[in-house]
Amino acid sequence: MSGGPVPVWKKYTTRPQGIWEKIRQLLVLVPNRSSGNPLVSLFRQVPPGERIKEAQNYKDPVTIPAGDIKGNPYFKRDYRRNYPQVHTFNQTKISGLLNLGSESNPRISIGEKGNKELAVFTNGQDVSLASTLKSVPASVVKGEVLGKSGEPIVAPSLNKFKWEILPEPVHGMYSEAYPCRIFTEKKVRSQSSA
């Protein structure tokens, strides 16, 4: 402790009383050192094992609705096995999208006529995609399926930039014999995209 040695009478340990304390101070090497035996009245109040009744009356806290089993089955809470659900598109669904459009670009009629058009694709009958491609207007095929002039749609290039490898005279750190490359700090546009 800072502030110098603590006198024995300030420590929470047992010590001799009266003349025995004076004899102890004469005989020991360090009189200010305590015996190390804690005072029973001041040590670990409440002692361990004292509150057995409180421990027996303990009730596990339950949070509602998370702890409620009804309406909260395990398979809904099981995030370890919550894999993405696989959805497929068959020829009937694709034919329906081509004929009736999508939510962003609908071509379906309003009202009862629209329900009849939709029933063709939802009643479980298989619709051939080849016959649908023949029957849909050319603007759908050349605009949504293919490009505007009938060319196939190509995915955009992900290599929009390339890194330039600096030669040894530019970076001046390693010779060409050392197998270490240094790249530019900025991306340089490739000639094809420029």
From Swiss-Prot:
Keywords: NAD, Oxidoreductase, Translocase, Ubiquinone, Virulence. InterPro entries: NADH_Ub_cplx-1_21kDa. The gene is NUO2. This is NADH-ubiquinone oxidoreductase subunit NUO2. The keyword NAD applies. PANTHER family: OXIDOREDUCTASE 21 KDA SUBUNIT, PUTATIVE (AFU_ORTHOLOGUE AFUA_4G05910)-RELATED. GO terms for molecular function: oxidoreductase activity. Disruption phenotype: Reduces mitochondrial NADH dehydrogenase activity. Leads to growth defects on glycerol and oleic acid, and shows reduced oxygen consumption rates. Decreases the mitochondrial membrane potential. Shortens the chronological life span (CLS). Leads to sensitivity to both cell wall-damaging agents calcofluor white and Congo red, as well as to thermosensitivity. Also increases the sensitivity to oxidative stress agents H(2)O(2) and menadione, as well as to osmotic stress agent KCl. Impairs the yeast to hypha transition. One of its GO terms (biological process) is mitochondrial respiratory chain complex I assembly. One of its GO terms (cellular component) is mitochondrion. Fungal-specific subunit of the mitochondrial membrane respiratory chain NADH dehydrogenase (Complex I). Complex I functions in the transfer of electrons from NADH to the respiratory chain. The immediate electron acceptor for the enzyme is believed to be ubiquinone. Plays a role in cell wall integrity and is involved in osmotic and oxidative resistance, yeast to hypha transition, and virulence via providing the ability to damage and invade host cells such as oral epithelial cells.
